[in-house]
Amino acid sequence: MAKTIQAIRGMNDCAPTESPLWQWIEAQVRNVLNSYGYSEVRMPIVESTPLFARAIGEVTDVVSKEMYTFWDNDEQLTLRPEGTAGCVRAAIEHGWIYNNEQRLWYIGPMFRHERPQKGRYRQFHQAGVEVFGIANPKIDAELIMLTYRLWKALGIDQYVTLQLNSIGSLEARANYRSALVGFLENHQDLMSDEEKDRLVKNPLRILDTKNPELQKVLDNAPKLLDYLDDESREHFEQLCSLLDAVGIQYEINPKLVRGLDYYNKTVFEWVTSALGAQGTVCGGGRYDGLVEQLGGHATPSIGFAMGLERLVLLVQEVNPNVPVKSAVDIYVVYQGEGTTLAAFELAEKVRSELPHLNTMLHCSGGNFKKQFKRADKSGATLALVIGESEVQNKQVVVKHLQGGADQQTLDLVNIIDYIQTQF
């Protein structure tokens, strides 16, 4: 026997028993985003490597350690580690953002070479939103309101907490960076080699360290909010006022900076403790300089992304009664001379007239006992049964697989009306 080939570590299959929940969550995402007037876009999975180096930042962990990169002739290419850079590239390339606002969303797989753990994988899926052309904090508030509406649709709104911060302008961050480095230089004895490297290359990333001793020290570190420029401070205060007005609760987290270099002003995360240690479900913020940085005109921009694997785990944990639709509603079984064509015609009739129902036709042979065993295993609500006598009399036997009504025989012309009463 040939040796079997396994999936790559950190890149997982989604089983037939798991996909209905994924489909339900994705449907809620699509419904909420479309209801706000946002438009779906689809970008390539592979992009030019310099796109991410320029957008995300050379010294970030994502670019320096986690990207899947390869050469194609003389061009260096990368499996996308996130969606914003590719969406900005597409918006510039196709002229989507000029002379009007654009509110876009996307969904799909991303790739990062990091240590696989619960809710964090090397191939993972994100739904993301990017908005171009709106500078005022109203759109910041709308994105947060949009995510909150989605959490309610998913039944997880009581298990997530909104954390907010403003990281200000480039100049404000430069001033804060100097103050933070001056403070941290006296505590290098507590730092790992990686943290010492961050102190030199990207000191703001130390703010979200997992080192407990360093976390205690950072409680007394300079606060970024104290270094904000007037414009960023006013923007942040207006955002907080809007959230207060609509009743969305939040925590101001002065250590929240996000892991990518393109952010400015507003940054936010929705976090949960329902999966054990606190983890991020959704995060985003403003990136007003990124479009210009990637070759476009200066364009105010904001966006967020949410991890679908995390959402799946969270929904499974806190909302076990999700109304997930079965993969099969109706199972057609048949046996005897002349029944095959009749069964095919019946299955197609149901699919044509009741397209919202999932109808499976038994195709692997066997007697009725074996076929009913398959029907039960499928999770279907009804079995439609055709034998030789049903073909002759133009009838169908209906069996309720989940209990309830007794088995009954109906004329073929009445079968659609009857099925409609059962769903």
From Swiss-Prot:
It is found in: Cytoplasm. One of its GO terms (cellular component) is cytoplasm. One of its GO terms (biological process) is histidyl-tRNA aminoacylation. It catalyses: tRNA(His) + L-histidine + ATP = L-histidyl-tRNA(His) + AMP + diphosphate + H(+). SUPFAM superfamilies: Class II aaRS ABD-related, Class II aaRS and biotin synthetases. GO terms for molecular function: ATP binding; histidine-tRNA ligase activity. Belongs to the class-II aminoacyl-tRNA synthetase family. Homodimer. This is Histidine--tRNA ligase.
